[in-house]
């Protein structure tokens, strides 16, 4: 079972999903869990199957003291770059919380200060602390739902399966059908970028 970072202060865990995708938003979540929260299944969202992720999504939504989820969409990603967009998404998720935490813990190694609240970046934090793991699950499940929704609009890219990640199938579809409004124009969508007509 994962640990709490500090039970004496209010800590929000933050994480993002979709940073490496060619299409769709980068999505972040921030979660404050009650100190009595326990769940043996809770872990980094990447290690969980769909059934467990969906179960935990509902559990976190029901039992979190407060949580926030935010998307940063393609235009902003292209304008400010994916790292800044990922941090912006986490800031926006924190803004949605019902109150500010005393401390923020973030998965990974890059973050920018949010409202002068102390923070710590923790590499592989989603496999160490419950609030970051909870944030990773909300970020992934909310983003996956969005990608499944836009799949209906552009089924040729099979986003319901690849979720916008750079799979062979996704790149083949880009080569065949071109780019959509959901693609990140600043990303290298194909090995030979010159062949894409924006």
From Swiss-Prot:
Sites where the protein binds a divalent metal cation: 15-16, 107
Keyword Transferase: no
GO molecular function terms listed in the Swiss-Prot or TrEMBL record: manganese ion binding; RNA binding; RNA-DNA hybrid ribonuclease activity
Record CDD domains: RNase_HII_bacteria_HII_like
InterPro entries on file: RNase_HII (IPR022898), RNase_HII/HIII (IPR001352), RNase_HII/HIII_dom (IPR024567), RNaseH-like_sf (IPR012337), RNaseH_sf (IPR036397)
Cofactor(s) this protein cannot do without: Mn(2+); Mg(2+)
Keywords: Cytoplasm, Endonuclease, Hydrolase, Manganese, Metal-binding, Nuclease
Catalytically driven reaction(s): Endonucleolytic cleavage to 5'-phosphomonoester
Location of the RNase H type-2 domain: 9-198
Subcellular location: Cytoplasm
EC number: 3.1.26.4
One Pfam family hit: RNase_HII
BP-aspect Gene Ontology terms: DNA replication, removal of RNA primer; mismatch repair
Gene Ontology CC entries for this record: cytoplasm; ribonuclease H2 complex
Principal EC category: hydrolase
Role: Endonuclease that specifically degrades the RNA of RNA-DNA hybrids.
Family under the similarity heading: Belongs to the RNase HII family.
Protein name (database record): Ribonuclease HII
Source organism of the structure: Christiangramia forsetii (strain DSM 17595 / CGMCC 1.15422 / KT0803) (Gramella forsetii)
Gene that produces this protein: rnhB
